[in-house]
């Protein structure tokens, strides 16, 4: 790892020292009018050891993006990481870490009882053929089983 500070926060994180699953505050940005954007790293798979398969990841993204908004109006975005090991969860004006954990917990429990993947069609999705409700539910189930570990980022 370079000693030089990188512009991208996650590039400065030593991925060999973290222990998934976890939820960590990755950054806070304050807007010109005082709004605070909180970005959380929701790591599901151990970096460089495992990754989510695309259909399951894609469906979990759709489900969490839709269902999380049933629990908060502070959600801005849930974005998958390119490495396929987790998601970025971005909220506005919401800095209560324990509440964020509860929000993720409630959302994942909603995923477990979902009957379909929202917006899983060619009109609403750019790769509608790449989805797996069962895969997303398996990821949610595994993540919830380790709920007590979410606040432990480093091994």
From Swiss-Prot:
Reaction equation(s) it catalyzes: S-(5-deoxy-D-ribos-5-yl)-L-homocysteine = (S)-4,5-dihydroxypentane-2,3-dione + L-homocysteine
Name of the top EC class for this enzyme: lyase
Keywords associated with the record: Autoinducer synthesis, Iron, Lyase, Metal-binding, Quorum sensing
TM region(s), chain numbering: none
InterPro entries in the record: LuxS_sf, Metalloenz_LuxS/M16, S-ribosylhomocysteinase
Cofactor(s) listed in the protein's UniProt record: Fe cation
Cofactor binding note from Swiss-Prot or TrEMBL: Binds 1 Fe cation per subunit.
Stored Pfam families: LuxS
Lyase among keywords: yes
Residues engaged in binding Fe cation: 58, 62, 125
Biological process (GO), any one: quorum sensing
Keyword Nucleus: no
Example GO molecular function: iron ion binding
EC number: 4.4.1.21
Subunit structure: Homodimer.
Role, per record: Involved in the synthesis of autoinducer 2 (AI-2) which is secreted by bacteria and is used to communicate both the cell density and the metabolic potential of the environment. The regulation of gene expression in response to changes in cell density is called quorum sensing. Catalyzes the transformation of S-ribosylhomocysteine (RHC) to homocysteine (HC) and 4,5-dihydroxy-2,3-pentadione (DPD).
Similarity remark: Belongs to the LuxS family.
Name listed for the protein in its UniProt record: S-ribosylhomocysteine lyase
Taxon lineage: Bacteria, Pseudomonadati, Pseudomonadota, Gammaproteobacteria, Oceanospirillales
